[in-house]
Amino acid sequence: MQWAEFQSPERGFAVSFPGTPKMTSVPVEGQNPLLQYDFQVSVGDNTVYSVTVFEYPAGKAPSRIDNDYYVRLVNAYAKGSEARLRKRGPVTVAGRSGFEAIADDGKGKLNHLVDIVPAGNRIYILATAGPRNHATGDDAERFRDSFRLLGEETQLQSAGTAPAPAQ
């Protein structure tokens, strides 16, 4: 597998993918004007790597992200992927406090690693799913550990405001 860093300055992140991601964007139903951006790479029949970015308008992101908020997000992920949460808890990703969960599909076939990283007006969800033991394997860790934010200037520009000039 050939891994390469993918950068999305518009969404404020970089991550290594094992291929070129397909990108889609949609408004989140019932949450207008919240937008969802998905970047996804599939490998073979049963392995996928994705970064989902929820982008809120300036000042509209959740102001208090606590354990309950994270639990609701990972429960929604598990429900959407027909998986059962096996392990969850706080984690540091890209130098930021976040949340991590491991889930299984109940058939013993797919294993998911999910990380949630809030940053400014965005919430990043890194998810990878693959065959048994994938969530604790080298490729899943490589994917998670390669994630980084591309700086506050990028976020300010994408929000429509230029950073203040240096004095």
Language-model region placement:
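N-terminal "mature-domain start" segment
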Residues: 1-34, 93, 141-167
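A short acidic-to-branched-hydrophobic micro-motif
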Residues: 38-68, 125-127
